[in-house]
C-alpha cells in the first residue's frame, strides 16, 4: 500500500459512510497534498471557506484533521514522499545565521560563528527588547519606532550613535533582552552550549528517593493514599520554618549574562566617553535581569500535605524589566569624561547634586525635544501622531504636539469581532469596520 493510500483513505474510511464521500472530498482537496505534507492547513482553510453546506464544512475539516494526524504518526515515512526532506526544527548554523545578519562587527561575527544558535536567540532577545521599548515610550515624542529592524542588528540606528537619555535606555534594554532570551533558551534545551543552571538543579534521584520515603512514612502513620499534590506558589509565601531544595530547571542566567557581555560589549573598541557610556548601560541592563530573578516552588506530598518543596529560579517578566529600566531612566545621570583615562565616568553636575550610582543609567548629551523631524538626532517629529486630549500623561495633545495644536479627524479601521467558538475546535470571527474620531497632531 502506498503512502498516498495510508494518508488519505485509511483514516477517512473509518468515518465516512461510502467511498463516494471520500472521492468527493479528496477531489476538492487534491491540490492540498503538498501543503499537508508541510503541516500547513492554509489550503484546507481555503476549501473550507468555499464549502456549500454545513455538512460539507464539517466533513472537509474532519478529513483535513485526520490527514494531518496520519502524517504526524507516519512522520518518518512521510518525509520521503515527493522527495521532501522536512526537518523538525529549522537548521541554525553559521551560514544561516551569521552570514545573513548585517550590522555585525568583526568581533561579533567571530562570536556568532562559534555559537550561531545562541546568537539567533540573542537577536530574538533584542527584538523583544525593541518591542518593550516601544511599549514603555508609547505616547512619548520619541517612541522607539526607529529601532524596528526586522530581526537585524539595530545598532546602526542613529540613537545608538548618540549620547542621549534615550540612547542609554536603548542600550540597557537591548543587553537585558539578550540575557533574558539566552538564559531561557538554555533552560528550554534549545542551545548546544548550555543547559539548566547546574548550581540550582539539585539531585533528581535523591529527591525522588526522599519523596518516596516521606510517602511511605505517611502511609505508616495512616495519613491516606499516596498521591502527589503539586501546587505552584510564590517563594515569598514560604515562612522561616519552611525548608526547600533546588529542583527543576532554572534558566542559566550566568551563561546568558556572559554571552550578552561577549556579544554586545565586543562592539566597543575605543575608550572614549561614548564607549564607556555604552558599556556602563549594557551592564546596568544585564544586572536588572540578574538582580530580579525570583524563586518559584512546587509542593510534593500526600493529599493535603507538603512534605517536600522543590524550587527553581525564573527570569522576571520582561515587562517588569522594561518598567524598572524606565524608572532608572527618569533619574539618569548626565556625565562627563574623566581627566584620567581609566574608563570611569563622573557626573557633570555640581558637587551638591547626586553622584552617579553604579546602577544608574548614564548619558552625556542632552536630548532634543523630538518635536520636529531631524534624522541626525533620530527624531521623526510628531506631526501626524495620534494624541489624547483628555490624558494627563505624555500622550496628551498639548505635550505630544509641542504646542502646534491638533486636528480632529475621522478614522476607519478593521478588527475581528463577534467571534464564535465552534465544536470542535475552531473560532470564526466577523470583520468589523469601526469609524471613530481621533486627535492628530498638526
Curated annotation (Swiss-Prot):
Mutant phenotype after disruption: Morpholino knockdown of the protein causes arrest of tooth development. Otherwise, mutant embryos appear grossly normal, excepting some cartilage abnormalities.
Localization in the cell: Secreted, Extracellular space, Extracellular matrix; Secreted
The keyword Electron transport is annotated on this UniProt entry: no
Lipidation (O-palmitoleoyl serine): 303
Glycosylation sites: 143, 388
Keywords from the UniProt entry: Developmental protein, Disulfide bond, Extracellular matrix, Glycoprotein, Lipoprotein, Secreted, Signal, Wnt signaling pathway
Record-linked SMART domains: WNT1
Pfam family, one: wnt
Description of post-translational modifications: Palmitoleoylation is required for efficient binding to frizzled receptors. Depalmitoleoylation leads to Wnt signaling pathway inhibition.
Membrane-spanning segments: none
One cellular component term from this protein's GO annotations in UniProt: extracellular space
InterPro entries attached to this UniProt entry: Wnt, Wnt10, Wnt_C, Wnt_CS
Protein origin, superkingdom: Eukaryota
Coiled-coil region(s): none
Primary location recorded for the protein, binned into one broad class: secreted
Disulfide linkage: 133-144, 186-194, 196-249, 297-311, 299-306, 371-402, 387-397, 401-441, 417-432, 419-429, 424-425
A Gene Ontology molecular function term of the record: frizzled binding
One GO-annotated biological process of the protein: neuron differentiation
Stated family: Belongs to the Wnt family.
More info: Wnt10a overexpression in embryos results in loss of anterior neural identity, causing a phenotype with small or no eyes.
Main function: Ligand for members of the frizzled family of seven transmembrane receptors. Required for normal tooth development. Regulates the expression of genes involved in tooth development.
The protein's name: Protein Wnt-10a
Source lineage: Eukaryota, Metazoa, Chordata, Craniata, Vertebrata
Amino acid at each position: 500500500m502506498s503512502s498516498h493510500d495510508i494518508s488519505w483513505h485509511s483514516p477517512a474510511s473509518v468515518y465516512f459512510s461510502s467511498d463516494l464521500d471520500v472521492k468527493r472530498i479528496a477531489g476538492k482537496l487534491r491540490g492540498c497534498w503538498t501543503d499537508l505534507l508541510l503541516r500547513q492547513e492554509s489550503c484546507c482553510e481555503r476549501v473550507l471557506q468555499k464549502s456549500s453546506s454545513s455538512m460539507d464544512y464539517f466533513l472537509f475539516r474532519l478529513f483535513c484533521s485526520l490527514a494531518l494526524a496520519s502524517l504526524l504518526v507516519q512522520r518518518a515515512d512521510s518525509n520521503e514522499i515527493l522527495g521532501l526532506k522536512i526537518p523538525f526544527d529549522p537548521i541554525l548554523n553559521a551560514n544561516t545565521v551569521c552570514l545573513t545578519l548585517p550590522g555585525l562587527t568583526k568581533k561579533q561575527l567571530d562570536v556568532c560563528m562559534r555559537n550561531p544558535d545562541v546568537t539567533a536567540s540573542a537577536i530574538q532577545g533584542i527584538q523583544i527588547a525593541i518591542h518593550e521599548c516601544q511599549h514603555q515610550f508609547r505616547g512619548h515624542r520619541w517612541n522607539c519606532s526607529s529601532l524596528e529592524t526586522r530581526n537585524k542588528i539595530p545598532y546602526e540606528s542613529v540613537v545608538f550613535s548618540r549620547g542621549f537619555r534615550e540612547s542609554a535606555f536603548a542600550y540597557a534594554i537591548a543587553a537585558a533582552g539578550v540575557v533574558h532570551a539566552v538564559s531561557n533558551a538554555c533552560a528550554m534545551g534549545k542551545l548546544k552550549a548550555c543547559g539548566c543552571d547546574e548550581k540550582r538543579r539539585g539531585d533528581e534521584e535523591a529527591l525522588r528517593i526522599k519523596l518516596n520515603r516521606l510517602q511511605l512514612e505517611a502511609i505508616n502513620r495512616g495519613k491516606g493514599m499516596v498521591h502527589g499534590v503539586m501546587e505552584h506558589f510564590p517563594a515569598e509565601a514560604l515562612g522561616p520554618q519552611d525548608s526547600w531544595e533546588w529542583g527543576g530547571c532554572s534558566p542559566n542566567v550566568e551563561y546568558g549574562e556572559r554571552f550578552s557581555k561577549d556579544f554586545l560589549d565586543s562592539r566597543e573598541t575605543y575608550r572614549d566617553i561614548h564607549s564607556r557610556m555604552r558599556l556602563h548601560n549594557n551592564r546596568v541592563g544585564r544586572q536588572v535581569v540578574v538582580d530580579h530573578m525570583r524563586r518559584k516552588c512546587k509542593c510534593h506530598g500526600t493529599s493535603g500535605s507538603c512534605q517536600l518543596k522543590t524550587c527553581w529560579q525564573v527570569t522576571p517578566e520582561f515587562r517588569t524589566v522594561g518598567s524598572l529600566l524606565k524608572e532608572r531612566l527618569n533619574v539618569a545621570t548626565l556625565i562627563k569624561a574623566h581627566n584620567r583615562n581609566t574608563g570611569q565616568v563622573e557626573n557633570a553636575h555640581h558637587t551638591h547634586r547626586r553622584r552617579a550610582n553604579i546602577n544608574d543609567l548614564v548619558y552625556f548629551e542632552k536630548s532634543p525635544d523630538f518635536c520636529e523631524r531631524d534624522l541626525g538626532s533620530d527624531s521623526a517629529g510628531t506631526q501626524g501622531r495620534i494624541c489624547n486630549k483628555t490624558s494627563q500623561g505624555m500622550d496628551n495633545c498639548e505635550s505630544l504636539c509641542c504646542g502646534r495644536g491638533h486636528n480632529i479627524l475621522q478614522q476607519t479601521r478593521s478588527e475581528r469581532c463577534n467571534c464564535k467558538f465552534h465544536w470542535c475546535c475552531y473560532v470564526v470571527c466577523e470583520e468589523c469596520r469601526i469609524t471613530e474620531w481621533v486627535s492628530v497632531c498638526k
